[in-house]
Amino acid sequence: MLPAHKQTLEALLADSVKQVAHALKGADAATVAPVITLERPKVAAHGDVACNVAMQLAKPLGTNPRQLAEQIVAALTAQPGAQGLVEAAEIAGPGFINLRLSAAAKQAVIAAVFDQGRAFGTSDREKGKQVLLEFVSANPTGPLHVGHGRQAALGDVLANVIASQGYAVHREFYYNDAGVQIGNLAISTQARARGLKPGDAGWPEAAYNGEYIADIARDFLNGETVAASDGEPVKGTGDVEDLDAIRKFAVTYLRREQDMDLQAFGVKFDQYYLESSLYSEGRVEKTVDALIKAGMTYEQDGALWLRTTDEGDDKDRVMRKSDGTYTYFVPDVAYHVTKWERGFTKVINIQGSDHHGTIARVRAGLQGLHIGIPKGYPDYVLHKMVTVMREGQEVKISKRAGSYVTVRDLIEWSGGAAAGQEAAPDLIDEATITRGRDAVRFFLISRKADTEFVFDIDLALKQNDENPVYYVQYAHARICSVLNELKSRYNVDVAQLPGADLSQLTSAQAASLMQKLAEYPDMLTHAANELAPHAVAFYLRDLAGEFHSFYNAERVLVDDEAPRNARAALLAATRQVLENGLAVLGVSAPAKM
């Protein structure tokens, strides 16, 4: 039901409970604190709304739950405010209160959608609050792989979901541009620049083997200039002995490549934060010194240890190794201090499940600083790995990266690019990229983050109801076609439909579709509260299913004006909610397919 109706019904039920409690307990009724929870029954025949408050309060009020439910229903239906909202009420099982909403209450969603348009489903309840959402945060050592793609989809959609509740969302990408892997990137590029290739004598053991390393080396030798979206241009010097120049060029080159990956995926960030800046600005040293002064560290075997067990970790952790270098979680602590200092009291990190072990360490470090950061800061959403399948076989390599499938591979393949075409980007048109982006974004958000995901390229290419993104987009396109035909055949424009006589919508299929439309705002709120962006994809598949059921049951383009316009109004509202939900997913809503 619509949020406004839900709030009204909750208030009416709470008032009814108070009346009954007072009648049973007198002055002692003030101690009764009901929790009114409204849910949609799993079986449609049981009504539109179910409430278990009678079973909650039967014992405190010293009565039978079914009898209590009957008294609550009697009090509820006697209230003037309920008479236009509730059509019928019945008691089920041990004391469930099942309510049927009035036809007018169900139909109200159509007017709400027409009135609010693209804003339908959104809320300003969190207006004035801000959230920092960090995601992707890949090392600039290669193209983005499919795991990064899942993280990008989760992060971007979750950002949209949270923003729908009024939050100001700051999207941030943390570049791990310092450390051993960056050194490996530099020596890999240097080896390629010297004419070596994987398998040759002298090829570094820790080197990256993808063909992209050869591309970097070629451009470095040719004196090409590269630039990331937020950085200064870097020119290749061609000096194969200058490892620092090679490192700088290679990192910038790959940051540019990752920028292009993200652009193809439709993901934008507000800020890119460089790990190297934490060192150059002295933030890592400052954080370590503060932990030492706070008594959170000790020396052992030439290393500096953090007392993470004080904050619930299973053992203390090394911060600074005996060779003077820091372990990887230390700059993470310093980085999160900057998030707090920048005023972000709510922070969400999206990471692979293989990073689970760092959570306790980072939180322990933050708590050990005693600067007011609350326990449990930051929040985490952990996701599991993605397996790519094509023609029944797992795909493990690509021409771009060598040892893994990249995000751009996945987008191009899912858009219909033939195997091998990814090596010739001039053959990939914008329509292919759009189809691929839509499929990849929808697929990667269509499962809970904590479940492993098998991405089936063949399924992404199917144009039938087995393909979930096609199924949802086709529902939108089909409605657009019907509304165009309505204009062509009957000269009825969508702008005229808010005046339709909605009392014509009497079928079970129409009622079920209206109920599903009304659930959209609460679904978004739930998805934001639970950090569950997959809920949007689940909802859209269900909504498309309800639409198809209605459309198959009732003809819309009939000569009788009243039922025709009422059914068309319901379709127009459904089209708007499909568009709104697809926009949250960052997926297009085509008018034709």
Curated annotation (Swiss-Prot):
Biological processes per GO annotation: arginyl-tRNA aminoacylation
What reaction does this catalyse? Answer: tRNA(Arg) + L-arginine + ATP = L-arginyl-tRNA(Arg) + AMP + diphosphate
Q: Which key words tag this protein in UniProt?
A: Aminoacyl-tRNA synthetase, ATP-binding, Cytoplasm, Ligase, Nucleotide-binding, Protein biosynthesis
What the entry lists under SMART domains is as follows: Arg_tRNA_synt_N (SM01016), DALR_1 (SM00836)
From the record, give the cysteines joined by S-S bonds. Answer: none
Q: Where is this motif: 'HIGH' region?
A: 138-148
Keyword presence, Aminoacyl-tRNA synthetase: yes
User: Has keyword Metal-binding?
Assistant: no
Q: A Pfam family name for this chain?
A: Arg_tRNA_synt_N
Can you list the GO cellular component terms from the UniProt entry?
cytoplasm
Subcellular location(s) per record: Cytoplasm
Return one GO MF term.
ATP binding
Q: Quaternary arrangement and interactors, per the entry?
A: Monomer.
Cite the PANTHER family for this sequence.
ARGININE--TRNA LIGASE, CYTOPLASMIC, ARGINYL-TRNA SYNTHETASE
> What name does the UniProt record give this protein?
Arginine--tRNA ligase
- The organism named in the record is Burkholderia lata (strain ATCC 17760 / DSM 23089 / LMG 22485 / NCIMB 9086 / R18194 / 383)
What gene name does this entry carry?
A: argS
